[in-house]
Structure formats: structure tokens, C-alpha cells
């Protein structure tokens, strides 16, 4: 009896052991088909926009129900941007035309978050008329002197469409919407047999301590820089230049002991807004830049500033791309280009190269 009982226990233990071994084998196979990337960059560099592009490119885009859910975000972004400009006027020594005083009061009386299926007519009319005011347009031209969302002008120019009956946000409306990222989000998509996992972390300073949870076993880092913010200050600390902050962050990530051999895909983002700022003097913010208003020279200069920070050039490669994260076709092209790079890195990581 004792021997039979013992054999039964042994059989159960062996079955459990075999099950664990089989699961470990399955996990190893899955790991070989999985590419993990960590998405990094300072606040408002375009990380969340890239993730939205992933959904458009690899997940079939947004359903009408999902698009409808973005209305409140888009309406709120639009009103918040107008309020930011109105609040900045006194410091800029600018004023509205007297006829717009009542419209100013209308916008300032609106709550920060708009919870409505349709943009109220009085708010839409106020935004439309204020956007035609010369003083307000001059404030937008000087937006580097205060905090203003990149999407402000786009939404102001779209106010007729956004306030029309039956409005449903377009892909471009959604791409330009802004919600501060907090915590860690994971985006997964498949290309062929490979599964890509992209981890996004909050870009603001207060969120960076959370990045450590994503550090292990990533195939590559995707680091975003907003080129257009070379003349702007941080949201959290208006004494710190945003480009200098991005350089400091890139330095700390690139040369971290966690990433000695981890390659970096560098997105030099917002090239469209960067080009619009060409008349602005870069030498004010980077005295060693001597390229004047030349776009290519400015791009090359900033690329060199980042790449030159790499202290492990022998073991770490930096792959740079100039991007406009709101341009789906361009991002699709860039993603296709880096998939080959990621595959090579992954095969090397798995010991298959």
C-alpha cells in the first residue's frame, strides 16, 4: 500500500514538474518572438502621438465610438489653449480689441474641462471671433514666452467644423489631442510572427522615477525630442530650457548602466513646427550654432548635440530619424524602416546572429 501511495505522489509531482517545464519552454518561445521597446522623452515630445499612430497603422484605427469619446478632450484642449493665451496677454503687454472683451469673459468663465457632446455655440462663436483678433494672433506668434499647446492653432482654424452638428473627430483631431500621461502604458501590436511591446512612461519630471519598472530586457529605446522646443521653457520649471532638459535626459538615459549595450532609436520630432520657427535666432539659446536660418544646418547641429553624448559608441548604436508624429504616412515609413533594425537587434539578443 505504502509503495502504491508513494508512486501516486511521485506521479503527481512529476506531472506538475512537466507542466512547469512545458510552460517555461512556451515562455522561452514567446520571448524569442517578442520585441520590447521603451518609449522615452521629455514631456510633450510626442510620445503619446506615436502610440496613437501605432493604433492607426496596426490596429485598424479608431471606431466611431472611440472617436466620439475624444470630443470632450478636443473641446477642452481648445478652450484651455484660448484661456492660456488670454491669461498671457497682460505679461506680453498685449490687448484685445474692445469689441472682444465680452468674448474674453465668456471663455474665462468656462470650466477647464468641457463635458458636452456638442461644443456650445457661445463658446464656439467666442473662439472664432477671438482668433481673428490681431492682439491674440500676436500673442500666439510669441507663444515661446508662455505655455501653449502645439495643437492650439490647428483647433482654432477648425472651430467651424468642430462646432458643426454631427461633428465626429477625425484621425488628425485625435492625433493632436493632449492628455498628460501618468504611470506606464503598454501598447502591443503584431507584425508577421513577431509581437512588439512598446512601453510609454510619463514624460514630466515627477513621472520619471516610474521608468525603472520598464528597464529590464528591452530590445531598444525609442527616445523622442521635440526640435521645435529649443526656444521654450519647461512646464514644470520655467527657468529651464526644454531642449537643454531633453539633452540632459538623453545623456542620463544613453549613458545609464542599465543601457550600456542597448541601442537607441532617436526621433527628432516636430520638424514641421521646427521649420516654421526658422526666423527665430537659435544662437540665443545655443551660442555655438553658426548656421543662421538654414534648416538642414540646424537639424544637423541638434542631431550632433544628441549623438555626441553617447559614451559607448563602440557597443551602442544610435539610429536617428527626423519625424512629424502627426503625419501618419511619414510615421508608417519610419516604422517600416526601424522594424528591420529591431529585428536584427532582437536576433542578436537571442543569440541567433
Curated annotation (Swiss-Prot):
SMART domains the record matches: G_alpha (SM00275)
Alphabetical list of Gene3D superfamilies matching this protein: GI Alpha 1, domain 2-like, P-loop containing nucleotide triphosphate hydrolases
GO biological process: G protein-coupled receptor signaling pathway; pheromone-dependent signal transduction involved in conjugation with cellular fusion
Stretch list, region G5 motif: 323-328
UniProt-annotated stretches for the region G1 motif: 36-49
UniProt function note: Guanine nucleotide-binding proteins (G proteins) are involved as modulators or transducers in various transmembrane signaling systems.
UniProt protein name: Guanine nucleotide-binding protein subunit alpha
Subunit-level organization: G proteins are composed of 3 units; alpha, beta and gamma. The alpha chain contains the guanine nucleotide binding site.
Entry keyword annotation includes Nucleotide-binding: yes
Residues annotated as domain G-alpha: 33-353
GO molecular function terms listed in the Swiss-Prot or TrEMBL record: G protein-coupled receptor binding; G-protein beta/gamma-subunit complex binding; GTP binding; GTPase activity; metal ion binding
Co-factor(s): Mg(2+)
Residues reported to bind Mg(2+): 48, 181
Pfam families, alphabetized: G-alpha
Family classification: Belongs to the G-alpha family. G(q) subfamily.
GO CC, alphabetical: cytoplasm; heterotrimeric G-protein complex
Assigned keywords, A-Z: GTP-binding, Hydrolase, Lipoprotein, Magnesium, Metal-binding, Myristate, Nucleotide-binding, Palmitate, Transducer
G3 motif: annotated segments: 196-205
Keyword GTP-binding among record annotations: yes
Lipid attachment site numbers (S-palmitoyl cysteine): 3
Region (G4 motif) location: 265-272
Binding positions for GTP per the UniProt entry: 44-49, 150, 175, 181, 203, 269-270, 272, 325
Lipidated residue numbers (N-myristoyl glycine): 2
Coiled-coil parts of chain: none
Record region (G2 motif): 173-181
Amino acid at each position: 500500500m505504502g509503495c502504491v501511495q508513494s508512486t501516486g505522489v511521485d506521479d503527481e509531482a512529476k506531472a506538475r514538474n512537466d507542466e512547469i517545464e512545458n510552460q517555461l519552454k512556451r515562455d522561452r518561445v514567446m520571448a524569442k518572438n517578442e520585441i520590447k521597446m521603451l518609449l522615452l522623452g521629455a514631456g510633450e515630445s510626442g510620445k503619446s502621438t506615436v502610440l496613437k499612430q501605432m493604433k492607426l497603422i496596426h490596429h485598424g484605427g479608431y471606431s466611431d465610438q472611440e472617436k466620439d469619446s475624444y470630443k470632450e478632450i478636443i473641446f477642452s484642449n481648445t478652450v484651455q489653449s484660448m484661456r492660456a493665451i488670454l491669461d498671457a496677454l497682460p505679461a506680453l503687454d498685449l490687448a484685445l480689441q474692445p469689441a472682444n472683451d465680452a468674448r474674453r469673459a465668456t471663455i474665462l468663465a468656462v470650466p477647464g474641462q468641457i463635458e458636452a457632446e456638442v461644443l456650445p455655440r457661445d463658446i464656439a462663436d467666442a473662439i472664432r471671433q477671438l482668433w481673428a483678433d490681431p492682439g491674440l494672433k500676436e500673442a500666439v506668434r510669441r507663444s515661446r514666452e508662455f505655455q501653449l499647446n502645439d495643437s492650439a492653432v490647428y483647433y482654432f482654424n477648425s472651430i467651424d467644423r468642430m462646432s458643426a452638428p454631427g461633428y465626429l473627430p477625425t484621425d488628425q483631431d485625435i492625433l493632436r489631442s493632449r492628455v498628460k500621461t501618468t504611470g506606464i502604458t503598454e501598447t502591443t501590436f503584431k507584425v508577421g510572427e513577431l509581437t512588439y511591446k512598446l512601453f510609454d512612461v510619463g514624460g514630466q519630471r515627477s513621472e520619471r522615477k516610474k521608468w525603472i519598472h520598464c528597464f529590464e530586457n528591452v530590445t531598444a529605446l525609442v527616445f523622442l525630442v521635440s526640435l521645435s522646443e529649443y526656444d521654450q521653457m519647461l512646464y514644470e520649471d520655467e527657468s529651464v530650457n526644454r531642449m537643454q532638459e531633453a539633452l540632459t535626459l538623453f545623456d542620463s538615459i544613453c549613458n545609464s548602466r542599465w543601457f550600456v549595450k542597448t541601442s537607441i532609436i532617436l526621433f527628432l520630432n516636430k520638424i514641421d513646427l521646427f521649420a516654421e520657427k526658422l526666423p527665430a535666432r537659435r544662437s540665443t539659446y545655443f551660442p555655438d550654432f553658426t548656421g543662421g536660418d538654414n534648416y538642414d544646418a540646424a537639424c544637423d547641429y541638434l542631431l550632433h548635440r544628441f549623438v555626441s553624448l553617447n559614451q559607448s559608441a563602440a557597443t551602442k548604436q544610435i539610429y536617428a530619424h527626423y519625424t512629424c508624429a502627426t503625419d501618419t504616412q511619414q510615421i508608417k515609413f519610419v516604422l517600416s524602416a526601424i522594424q528591420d533594425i529591431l529585428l536584427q537587434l532582437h536576433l542578436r539578443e537571442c543569440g541567433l546572429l
